[in-house]
Amino acid sequence: MHRIVYLERDSIIAEVRRPDFPHHWAEHAKTLQSEVKERLAGATIAIVNKLQIDAELIAALPALQMVAVAATGANNIDLEACRVRGIVVSNIRGYASHTVPEHVLAMLLALSRNIFAYRQAVADGSWQRAEQFCFFDYPIRDLHGATLALIGSGNLGSGVARLAGAFGMHVLRSERKDALSVRPGYTLFAEALRQADAVSLHCPLSAETSKLIGESELRSMKPSALLINTARGGLVDETALARALQEGWIAGAGFDVLSVEPPRDGNPLLAPELLALPNFMLTPHIAWASQPAMQALADQLISNLEAFARGEPQHVLT
């Protein structure tokens, strides 16, 4: 009988049905990293979201057969160590194909039309003091006709492309940063950044993509460009982004992720002066979290467990 331990149950707000095979189920609302080893002792299946499962931990868990990641990103799992041990690692795919693209477009619309600046102008009485029916203190740009560069063209990037196309945007699919050749339908990374009125990140975080967007990339973008990140905080040099926003290298940014989550003191993107800027949006990693998306995630999570128990594992990363 499988022993299943769910370490971060509170990370999704959805009904999680029990698998259809014989098992013992234990779940914890939250788990500290220091508690993982003890709680997974004897487990054959671990369900995790953001907790680290590294080689040292894997070596201490001889019964472990499967790590079910309740998310798409699995940069918190030592996949090679799991592969060597024969541990199956599965992730969730396709569940956020509507909710994340909608969040991206919401950020693009709010920033391109300076919604927050104009809302504040009403709140502080600027409109009420105006001498005509409206005022134009902040530029308003249409998405129609603008160029959007996508870095990452998988399920989520393609979803953003579909919505952007409906708004009349011209979509560029960026080639990998260090690619020696360009695939048909793609644009050189550096050229995509230079042409873009907005850049949206949808690639996984890895050693190759860490700080993919740094000072040189930000300076190469148009001063009127926007940067959107709903993928992973580590894709961007956060110190460089803070400078870019304060010094006007780019026009604005919308982020749903930070390099360390939950964020702690010291992250440059949490500086009060930055959060006060009307051209910077920061949301608490909720682009994926519409109710339908979370339920789809929960359903697929259990489906992954059942497929593994049948000897037909799906969505395998190892």
Predicted segment positions?
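Rossmann-like dinucleotide-binding domain for NAD(H)/NADP(H)
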Residues: 224, 230-318
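Rossmann-fold NAD(P) dinucleotide-binding segment
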Residues: 52-64, 79-81, 208-227
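Rossmann-like dinucleotide/phosphate-binding beta-alpha-beta segment
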Residues: 21, 134-223
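Short glycine-/small-residue-rich Rossmann-like dinucleotide-binding loops
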Residues: 51, 72, 197, 203-205, ...
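N-terminal glycine-/charge-rich "phosphate-binding" loop or analogous flexible N-terminal tail
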Residues: 1-43, 172
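An anion/phosphate-binding loop that grips the pyrophosphate of nucleotide cofactors and donors
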Residues: 43, 61, 195-196
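Phosphate-binding beta-alpha-beta segment of Rossmann-like dinucleotide-binding domains, i.e.
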Residues: 93-147
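Short beta->alpha connector loops at strand-helix junctions that form conserved
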Residues: 29, 70-71, 87-98, 175, ...
